[in-house]
Amino acid sequence: MMQTRAHSLRHQTGLTLVELMVALAIGSFLIIGAIQIYNQSRQAFVVNESIARVQETAQFAMDTIETDLRMASNWGRNSRGLAVEGRSLVGDANPTGLTVPAPTCGDTWAFDLGRPIDGSDNAYNLACGASGGAAGNSDVITVRRASVQPVAPELGRLQIQSTRIQGELFETDTIPAAFLPVTNNPITGVPSSGTHNLMVNSYYVSPTSTLIPGVPTLRRKTLTVRNGVPVIEDQEVAPGVESIQLQLGIDVDQDNTVDRYVNPGDDVYNPAADDYIPGVRVMTARIWLVVRGVTTEFGLRDARTYQPGNVNMGQMNDSFRRLQVSKTILLRNART
């Protein structure tokens, strides 16, 4: 009986030191592996989140500009800007004496309906100041059009009254006499003319955002009304946009095909310029955007060379993530 008990006690002495060390080593390896997997997953999440933010910014900025461009030269009931009375003429920026929106971006900025798409090449050429300055490697894109939905006449707002063949700019709360009386088509019920708000937007890049100081941003000068007076507001559109570039596809022989691409502000489509080509039409718009993240990324070095449009931005050699996108947009109203 005593021998059995002594034998049992000798076999209940616990783990040896070697066994304990092996167990601790295995546990340590498992913990280290779990931490590495966590860190890698966290790093992948941060990278994916950064990529998604840059892509979202690029998509939003492109969609905003594209929406305007696709509706350029829409004047309500027709798409012929040269048929709108009150538009800027060669030598007469404001023939009917309409109120020039303040702060003025130029005498023809709001009224040059003969050029529904315009701009400047790698320079800020508007008379109104750029909020926070303007980036030197970026174009200015100006789009003129009318609102899609008809509205009621509004005192102080620049509007267009139009039919299928003519139009007129006005700013009173009364429809111009040339379009009275407004009658409805007996079959379709459509009024003989419609009132639409004049819309003018000039997109540009500022080197610093008001929302996120130090970050470049896409901004626009937009025509609106305040206290019964037409004014120009400066709005921030998308922080993170470093450059916008525009080229216009023009048709010079009236065959509804693009013959060549020119930079914004080119004289070939400016009726007041010596190199103007009579009958030229802008058929397409090609847009480039360079978008960057709003914060730096650890371990990232951007060594790519960016060449949007006709500008070479070179290598940035910093820790911001960037994306360059481009799109060619058909201008539907140029064909009608």
List the predicted regions and their residue ranges:
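N-terminal pilin/flagellin-like segments and related low-complexity appendage regions
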Residues: 61-284, 288, 294-321, 336
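Flexible, small/polar- and glycine-enriched "cap/hinge" segments at structural transition points
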Residues: 331-332
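A generic, residue-level signal for flexible/boundary positions that often mark functional hotspots
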Residues: 45-48, 231, 323
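Aliphatic-rich helix starts adjacent to a transmembrane/signal segment
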Residues: 2-8, 13-18, 22-74
